[in-house]
């Protein structure tokens, strides 16, 4: 709307009534499960339904717990209100012809306490996926969108030494509407020990990294992320070094943030056109007071 346009107040009144059921077994060492579903029978979202479920089994491996779990859902949902209606000075839309979104997901997870290992994977199919296009307007994709993800988390602990690692793989069947970095990783290496039997010290460094991709642009006017194909983000290691101290009820830290900016090409962005902070030395103190 322009400065000379006349604004008209518009009131929306929506309601929906759902019926649902749930069945679960939360006790037991061999098998636990939970399943629930709901259906909209009256109102603006009539026909909308959600069905979710998960199950888990537990057993001993090398004298420690190991679990295998699976989860999934089927959904048929109406696009959110602000995807259909939004009125502001810079953006204005009324999408009355949007179709319902269908989602089918299946995933599994393995957790091995004996080796400090976690494995997970999942696949999702989305029909009529809604996204924000390059102009910052909501748009609905025709056809299916598939997303595959796999993740492994491996921790190594030996006396004072700790090493935490996590790697994720993601694949989108249509990167023009849902861009994802193909590989993301996090690693954190540290030493944790006591000084004079009272001061806990943690000295270490961590790193975040993801492969380059056309990361979404954040539009402040709508507070949403929209797709773009102008600049790629990623392929830059965000390295931080830190020292944490814990003395009774007091905790304090010193961190060198984004050390990599001192040694490599400063092409570091978290989102399109949103750079990360350059090297910064951070310090902080926290004290817990008991009443």
Can you describe what each PLM-predicted range is?
Residues 1, 5-291:
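Exposed, low-structure sequence patches enriched in small/polar residues
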């Amino acid at each position: 709307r322009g400065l000379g346009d006349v604004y008209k107040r518009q009131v929306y009144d929506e309601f929906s009534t759902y019926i649902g059921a749930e069945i679960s077994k939360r006790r037991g060492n061999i098998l636990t499960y939970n399943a629930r579903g709901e259906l909209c029978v009256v109102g603006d979202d009539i026909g909308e339904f959600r069905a979710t479920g998960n199950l888990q089994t537990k057993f001993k491996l090398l004298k420690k717990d190991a679990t295998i779990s699976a989860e999934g859902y089927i959904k048929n949902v109406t696009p959110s209100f602000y995807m259909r209606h939004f009125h502001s000075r810079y953006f204005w839309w009324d999408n009355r012809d949007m179709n319902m979104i269908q989602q089918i997901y299946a995933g599994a997870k393995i957790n091995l306490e004996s080796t400090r290992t976690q494995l997970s994977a999942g696949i999702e199919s989305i029909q009529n996926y809604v996204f924000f296009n390059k102009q910052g307007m909501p748009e609905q994709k025709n056809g299916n969108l598939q997303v595959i993800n796999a993740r492994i988390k491996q921790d190594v602990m030996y006396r004072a030494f700790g090493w935490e690692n996590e790697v994720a793989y993601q694949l989108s069947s249509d990167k023009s509407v849902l861009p994802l970095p193909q590989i993301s990783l996090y690693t954190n290496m540290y030493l944790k020990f006591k000084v004079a039997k009272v001061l806990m010290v943690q000295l270490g460094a961590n790193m975040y990294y993801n492969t380059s991709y056309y990361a979404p642009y954040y539009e402040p006017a709508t507070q949403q992320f929209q797709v773009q194909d102008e600049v790629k983000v990623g392929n830059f290691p965000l390295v931080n070094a830190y020292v944490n101290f814990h003395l009774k009820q007091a905790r304090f830290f010193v961190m060198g943030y984004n050390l990599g900016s001192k040694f490599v090409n400063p092409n570091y962005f978290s989102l399109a056109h949103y750079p990360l902070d350059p090297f910064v030395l951070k310090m902080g103190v926290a004290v817990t007071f008991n009443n």
